[in-house]
Curated annotation (Swiss-Prot):
Contains two distinct DNA-binding domains. One is located in the N-terminal region and binds to the 5'-CAACA-3' motif. The second is located in the C-terminal region and binds to the 5'-CACCTG-3' motif. CDD domains: AP2 (cd00018), B3_DNA (cd10017). This is AP2/ERF and B3 domain-containing transcription factor RAV1. The gene is RAV1. It comes from Arabidopsis thaliana (Mouse-ear cress). Expressed in all tissues examined: Roots, rosette leaves, cauline leaves, inflorescence stems, flowers and siliques. Highest expression in roots and rosette leaves. Very low expression in flowers. Its main location: nucleus.
Amino acid sequence: MESSSVDESTTSTGSICETPAITPAKKSSVGNLYRMGSGSSVVLDSENGVEAESRKLPSSKYKGVVPQPNGRWGAQIYEKHQRVWLGTFNEEDEAARAYDVAVHRFRRRDAVTNFKDVKMDEDEVDFLNSHSKSEIVDMLRKHTYNEELEQSKRRRNGNGNMTRTLLTSGLSNDGVSTTGFRSAEALFEKAVTPSDVGKLNRLVIPKHHAEKHFPLPSSNVSVKGVLLNFEDVNGKVWRFRYSYWNSSQSYVLTKGWSRFVKEKNLRAGDVVSFSRSNGQDQQLYIGWKSRSGSDLDAGRVLRLFGVNISPESSRNDVVGNKRVNDTEMLSLVCSKKQRIFHAS
């Protein structure tokens, strides 16, 4: 199992639109990047002042590339009149290629690239479209874009589809496989607590599971954290920072976790499951199911009084900004129907 770590000091939760700064020459972050599963996270390294210094240096022949006082080259792109820093590179053409990748993601059909003879294949286009702008910027800044692209291509079969096979059983009432993939080894499950899905924006991993399945390379890395990729049953990749907190002596998933909680509508008592592929890539997977543990088929929908009553609707129906369950919704529908009956 591989792993990847990135200095936490380069990470913030701000916008991706940041202004680069003068920094002393240093080695590429690739050398310090460990990988666990297929890890990554959004890293925002705000640097200020490079633009002023760059004006004193010869300009680049490439679009979106600026010279650095230390002899290296920076790449940048503008989004809504704000500059997005794409990273620093040893070679001018490396920075130009990073700009080309970003402009494809930001401008799509309107992209004007430096290397017009280089055409993206369908796999790369799909890869770009399946990741947010901030995720692509993150990969470029950490010089992991090419590696993650190749990993994505290896997970595809000859038809260009993800090579995953759902289990024929084990579907939760959210329509999601709790174990994920037939070729995957189930690692462990955890019922999330109120604090796991609350404002702390972190998931505590039980210590014995953390040390067995997600061992950190060293104490130094434990503090900085490693970057993990988990793929869900829909093929979406979730990026979490995983580290050890000395203050609470616990292993936690932090950055990226709150987005997962929000999208999957997790509540206290719901169960998240983790598994790993048996293949050479050791891909990590994440699944989830509601606390009810119902074995209802997600495709089975009861239609009553013109309303679809299903597990999904029970979790998402909102009336007057208040979430209601199936029973409450049915009561509302019946009362409305009764009023209409008497009126006629």
